[in-house]
């Protein structure tokens, strides 16, 4: 009897030991699971915190004006029938046509000009630039020593000159000489893009809005005044007796826009037909300020014209007009006010 009880006791103890061991294993598994979850949570929290701090530290572009040079360039520039890739913002330009020097001065980019034409307008500050000749007679050695990013011209260079510059790694951009107000504006847009890349679009629009306002102020009062009065007959005389602005020229078109009857419309390409000389009876003569007015007064063609008899000979700075820039508008304002002073309160 006693032996049987002992065996039972031993069996019971073995079962209890197994039960306790199994319960401890379960508790350990639960603790491991809890620790694993806690570790995953901490890892996720640290990762998200680092990402947030990194985003806070990264600079952000707020608007278009904050674009870097890399972001504003490269751009493709279409000039005439040619396309140019402007890889980065130009640091240096050589400009061999006076009208392009004026245009860059107008848009505030004259500081980029490291080489300028010999006939550059004195009104544009070029203190840091070297004289490099002209488009038709360039100083190639000087150009190569200046090392511009681009050479700009408004008349075609000789192919031999272009090839020598290309061998030195310098490209030439040939602009069309503008023959209308629209083409003047388009050239300004192109120059803004060349100098400022994508930012140039906004800069160009702001500039051209001011340009148009300035032009309207110069000539609109005269054009409105002639609606209630008769037009004056006028010519824009480059050389006596028949070299004058004809109908297809910009100067001829501007005479019309200012409310004048341009007698030069009978001619073409700055040449008036001599056989029509009897029709040359202008009320006002705008002439190149480099001319001696006595040449006009003594001319058999104009000596008895209303313009000479009433002393309506108005000098005009033709060089400023040919620059096709802001100085041209100043000359137009003087012409319009001379012809129709009443329209301007005179």
Which stretches of residues belong to each language-model region?
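Bacterial N-terminal signal peptides
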Residues: 38-47
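Structured C-terminal subdomain patch of bacterial secreted/periplasmic proteins
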Residues: 182-196, 220-223, 286-346
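Short helix-initiation/N-cap motifs at beta->coil->alpha
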Residues: 79-80, 130-141, 267-275
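Alpha-helical, coiled-coil/dimerization segments enriched in small aliphatic residues
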Residues: 119-122, 242-271
């Amino acid at each position: 009897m006693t032996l049987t009880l002992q065996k039972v006791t031993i069996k019971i103890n073995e079962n209890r030991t197994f039960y306790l061991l199994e319960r401890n294993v379960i508790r350990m598994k639960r603790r491991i699971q809890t620790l694993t979850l806690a570790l995953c949570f901490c890892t996720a929290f640290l990762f998200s915190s680092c990402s947030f701090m990194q985003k806070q530290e990264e600079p952000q572009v707020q608007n278009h004006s904050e674009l870097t040079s890399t972001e504003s360039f490269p751009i493709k520039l279409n000039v005439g029938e040619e396309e140019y890739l402007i890889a980065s913002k130009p640091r240096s330009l050589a400009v061999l046509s006076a009208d392009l020097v004026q245009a860059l001065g107008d848009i505030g980019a004259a500081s980029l000009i490291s080489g300028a034409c010999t006939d550059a307008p004195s009104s544009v500050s070029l203190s840091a630039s070297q004289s490099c000749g002209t488009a038709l007679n360039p100083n190639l050695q000087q150009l190569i020593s200046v090392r511009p990013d681009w050479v700009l011209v408004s008349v075609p260079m000789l192919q031999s000159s272009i090839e020598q510059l290309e061998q030195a790694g310098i490209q030439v951009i040939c602009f069309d000489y503008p023959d209308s107000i629209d083409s003047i504006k388009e050239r300004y847009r192109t120059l803004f893009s060349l100098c400022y890349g994508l930012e140039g679009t906004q800069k160009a629009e702001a500039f051209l809005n001011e340009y148009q306002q300035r032009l309207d102020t110069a000539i609109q009062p005269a054009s409105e005044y002639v609606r209630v009065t008769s037009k004056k007959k006028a010519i824009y005389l480059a050389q006596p007796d028949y070299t004058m602005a004809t109908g297809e020229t910009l100067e001829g078109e501007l005479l019309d826009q200012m409310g004048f009857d341009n007698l030069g419309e009978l001619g073409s390409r700055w040449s008036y037909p001599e056989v029509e000389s009897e029709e040359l009876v202008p009320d006002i003569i705008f002439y190149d300020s480099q001319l001696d007015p006595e040449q006009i007064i003594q001319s058999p063609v104009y000596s008895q014209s209303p313009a000479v008899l009433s002393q309506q000979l108005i000098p005009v700075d033709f060089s400023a007009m040919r620059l096709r820039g802001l100085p041209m508008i100043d000359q137009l304002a003087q012409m319009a006010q001379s012809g129709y002073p009443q329209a301007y309160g005179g």
